[in-house]
Amino acid sequence: MASSINGRKPSEIFKAQALLYKHIYAFIDSMSLKWAVEMNIPNIIQNHGKPISLSNLVSILQVPSSKIGNVRRLMRYLAHNGFFEIITKEEESYALTVASELLVRGSDLCLAPMVECVLDPTLSGSYHELKKWIYEEDLTLFGVTLGSGFWDFLDKNPEYNTSFNDAMASDSKLINLALRDCDFVFDGLESIVDVGGGTGTTAKIICETFPKLKCIVFDRPQVVENLSGSNNLTYVGGDMFTSIPNADAVLLKYILHNWTDKDCLRILKKCKEAVTNDGKRGKVTIIDMVIDKKKDENQVTQIKLLMDVNMACLNGKERNEEEWKKLFIEAGFQHYKISPLTGFLSLIEIYP
């Protein structure tokens, strides 16, 4: 009979140990990815025009000969995680995968700014203080570590604010790729206001695709004050908790998950005012996550739950359908419709 410890078979214990160690060292996943972006390796491979050998790569990187083996180790691990493909012919070489193509700077779809922003110690380092944060009654995690709320911190730190805006713009480009196939969202509209629209990455795509549609990018004054519009694109500074420009539709992309239910109700009520002015009955379009552990694949659920923890550190949250529905009803909306948008994002349309 096989031995056991506390009623557990050794095989169970060793499997649990492997799981534990996987998560203890999971920070290396993020940090090795950050290293590849900082070293500009995706662009180096792209510019090489074919898989690049280890010797060519380290020559371009100009690393000491004593670190060549370490470059190989990092590339091997990144390849194991799906970011590069190892080609073994005469010499070990590396090719881009779909994932690392998303890290090529200068490409239409580049998420390198997202890697840099999220993995900056300003943000990622805050997670060392989870224990302290959990005992603080009102402070967000960033309030504990940065000494102010996240949005106030951005206002006072222009360099990181630029990094954050670049990251959001890079992510918007992928969302825009999905929106191009969502004509039904914009059918019949004459105007739309993108609340929290940043520098206008999404609004510009909407304007190009629907040139007769008037688009307003509405964000904090310090975000939009130096931005120039076009014939059908304007920038307006203000506070979404106070008032939102009137339009046929309001777009909330990655906005509501930043806020508590109480704050979301305030925002949604202002949105309702904006789309029902002058007797009109417009709509509010939300691009956000909808947690559904029953229907989603495990990897998609993991992304959503990771983001839920991340949003909790802002006092926000990701929501399931019932939680969304409760918000909509309390804000005075009559019905809603949820459609899939990307791998983990949904398109939610709500009507007053």
UniProtKB/Swiss-Prot annotation:
It catalyses: a 7-hydroxyisoflavone + S-adenosyl-L-methionine = a 7-methoxyisoflavone + S-adenosyl-L-homocysteine + H(+). Its EC number is 2.1.1.150. Disulfide bonds: none annotated. One of its GO terms (biological process) is methylation. SUPFAM superfamilies: S-adenosyl-L-methionine-dependent methyltransferases, Winged helix' DNA-binding domain. Pathway: Phytoalexin biosynthesis; medicarpin biosynthesis. It is an enzyme of class 2 (transferase). The keyword Methyltransferase applies. Keywords: Methyltransferase, S-adenosyl-L-methionine, Transferase. Substrate binds at V118, L119, D120, P121, T122, L123, S124, G125, S126, Y127. S-adenosyl-L-methionine binds at G196, D219, D239, M240, K253. The active site is at H257. Transmembrane segments: none annotated. Belongs to the class I-like SAM-binding methyltransferase superfamily. Cation-independent O-methyltransferase family. COMT subfamily. Homodimer. Transfers a methyl group to 7-hydroxyls of the isoflavones daidzein, genistein and 6,7,4'-trihydroxyisoflavone. Can also methylate (+)6a-hydroxymaackiain with lower efficiency. This is Isoflavone-7-O-methyltransferase 8.
